[in-house]
């Protein structure tokens, strides 16, 4: 009679964690950073259809790395959670902390009970009336939650890019300064002595603008993004508002 195969709980959890980390490492990094007028999100993403940065509720946004179908399901669940809570109670009762707790329960349950963990890492951010009131939560594949301040980097090169952000980011940067910094950080170190530059068309950028009265989320693209990346510090407004001729920046929500 053969003995049943046994795997210790410690080894099982380690294998699941390694599996999830490998899946996350294959994704391009996402940087979330505070600026003087709110919170900016940026990632290298040539796709126009598949977003890694999205609006959840009035002043709450979501960013993720990993398997698209898995974090897209989480995004949709987050939108439904926020809508239901806002409808049942009050819109002011919907906050990033509650959403992060809901995500943590889902991620933790899947990690411990399902056959495979979710290969995702997500950030839930909420812009407040002042920079002191901003909330940024980072959630890992196992449901662990970290309360971040200033900026956070996710993805395969998170440690290396996080070091670069630590050295160069500081409170009070304008949106233009933050986006130019993030693009340089995402490009990584020079290759063969030549720095790599990410085209603006390959960047997915959005902001939570604290000056907007209700829906703070705004995508930044087209001429507005070009101006922010090229202009000297402080010449473009922190909101990314369209100019008189119109721009490709979209107003709130996904397409």
Curated annotation (Swiss-Prot):
Alphabetized Pfam families for the sequence: Proteasome
PROSITE patterns: PROTEASOME_ALPHA_2
SUPFAM superfamilies named in the record: N-terminal nucleophile aminohydrolases (Ntn hydrolases) (SSF56235)
Disulfide bonds: none
Highest taxon in the source lineage: Bacteria
One Gene Ontology CC term in the entry: proteasome core complex, alpha-subunit complex
Sequence ranges of Low complexity compositional bias: 232-255
Keywords of this entry: Cytoplasm, Proteasome
GO biological process: modification-dependent protein catabolic process; proteasomal protein catabolic process
Activity regulation (record text): The formation of the proteasomal ATPase ARC-20S proteasome complex, likely via the docking of the C-termini of ARC into the intersubunit pockets in the alpha-rings, may trigger opening of the gate for substrate entry. Interconversion between the open-gate and close-gate conformations leads to a dynamic regulation of the 20S proteasome proteolysis activity.
Location in the cell: Cytoplasm
GO molecular-function terms, A-Z: threonine-type endopeptidase activity
Pathway of action: Protein degradation; proteasomal Pup-dependent pathway
Region (Disordered): 228-255
Secretion signal, residue range per the UniProt entry: none
Function noted in UniProt: Component of the proteasome core, a large protease complex with broad specificity involved in protein degradation.
Family: Belongs to the peptidase T1A family.
Assembly and oligomerization: The 20S proteasome core is composed of 14 alpha and 14 beta subunits that assemble into four stacked heptameric rings, resulting in a barrel-shaped structure. The two inner rings, each composed of seven catalytic beta subunits, are sandwiched by two outer rings, each composed of seven alpha subunits. The catalytic chamber with the active sites is on the inside of the barrel. Has a gated structure, the ends of the cylinder being occluded by the N-termini of the alpha-subunits. Is capped by the proteasome-associated ATPase, ARC.
Name assigned to this protein: Proteasome subunit alpha
Protein's organism: Sanguibacter keddieii (strain ATCC 51767 / DSM 10542 / NCFB 3025 / ST-74)
């Amino acid at each position: 009679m053969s003995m049943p195969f046994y795997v210790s709980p410690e080894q099982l959890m380690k294998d699941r964690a390694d599996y999830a980390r490998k899946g996350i490492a294959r994704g391009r990094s996402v940087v979330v950073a505070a600026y003087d007028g709110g919170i900016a999100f940026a990632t290298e993403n040539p796709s126009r259809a598949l977003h890694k940065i999205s609006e959840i509720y009035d002043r709450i946004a979501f960013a993720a790395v990993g398997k698209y179908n898995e974090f897209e399901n989480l995004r949709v669940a987050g939108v439904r959670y926020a809508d239901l809570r806002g409808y049942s109670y009050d819109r002011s009762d919907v906050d990033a902390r509650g959403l992060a707790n809901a995500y943590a329960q889902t991620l933790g349950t899947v990690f411990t009970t399902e056959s495979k963990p979710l290969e995702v890492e997500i950030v839930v951010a909420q812009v407040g009336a002042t920079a002191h009131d901003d909330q940024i939560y980072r959630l890992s594949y196992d449901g662990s939650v970290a309360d971040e301040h200033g900026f956070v980097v996710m993805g395969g090169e998170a440690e290396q890019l996080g070091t670069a952000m630590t050295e160069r980011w500081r409170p009070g940067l304008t949106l233009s300064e933050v986006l130019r910094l993030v693009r340089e950080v995402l490009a990584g170190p020079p290759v063969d002595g030549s720095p790599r530059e990410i085209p603006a068309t390959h960047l997915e950028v959005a902001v939570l603008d604290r000056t907007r009265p209700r829906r703070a989320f705004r995508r930044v693209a087209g001429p507005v993004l070009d101006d922010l990346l090229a202009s000297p510090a402080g010449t473009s407004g922190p909101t990314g508002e369209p100019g008189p001729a119109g721009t490709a920046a979209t107003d709130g929500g996904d397409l």
